[in-house]
Amino acid sequence: MIVLNNKIYLELLEDDLQPKKTFLNTDADLLKYCKVLDVGNNVFEVKKGDIIMLYVININFIDTNKGFCSDRDVIFINNRPREKKVHINNQQKEKYGILYKASVVASSSNDINDGDEIYYKQGQSHILPDNTEILSETQIFYKKG
């Protein structure tokens, strides 16, 4: 099999390695961890052998635990946000005029580190079931420093 374009061939990890439901994360079963078996010729950020997280609805299953997704469907790569994305703790968010303040959980940006306090404009973010949020680094105006 030769995977083409921006497609990722993947396999679900075992159930005991999947996100767990908690009091704050009641929709954990919507997200799945998968091992990347192969990638298409237009996939640059994800590599064979990586562990990725994505919504189960974005997996095109070809059997019970293997399938395909697009590189755009990936939320986390090896427990880090995709390139130029920042994972924030939405529960500590505070509004300051038109900007919001939040604490960074994880970042793939060179300028923003885990634990930084950032100020950003709300918009095209991706809210996860555990009430954390993935946003583009272009939404961030500044960090406390």
Predicted regions and their residues:
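Acidic-enriched and Gly/Ser
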Residues: 1-145
